[in-house]
Amino acid sequence: GVGDLIRKAVAAIKNIV
């Protein structure tokens, strides 16, 4: 769902940082 997309985006950002 939308929450999954947001969590994936947050995880991607954390991986970049």
Swiss-Prot record:
Show the Pfam families listed in the entry.
Antimicrobial_8 (PF08103)
Could you confirm whether the keyword NAD appears in this record?
no
Name where it mostly resides. secreted
- Asked if the Swiss-Prot or TrEMBL record annotates the protein with the keyword Secreted, the reply is yes
The tissues in which it is expressed are:
Expressed by the skin dorsal glands.
Q: Name one GO cellular component term.
A: extracellular region
What are the Valine amide sites (modified residues) in this protein?
A: V17
InterPro entries in the record, alphabetically?
Antimicrobial_8
Q: Please name the GO terms of the biological process aspect recorded for this protein, alphabetically.
A: defense response
Keywords, A to Z? Amidation, Amphibian defense peptide, Secreted
Compartments where found: Secreted
- Its name, as the record gives it, is Uperin-3.4
To which species is this protein native? Uperoleia mjobergii (Mjoberg's toadlet)
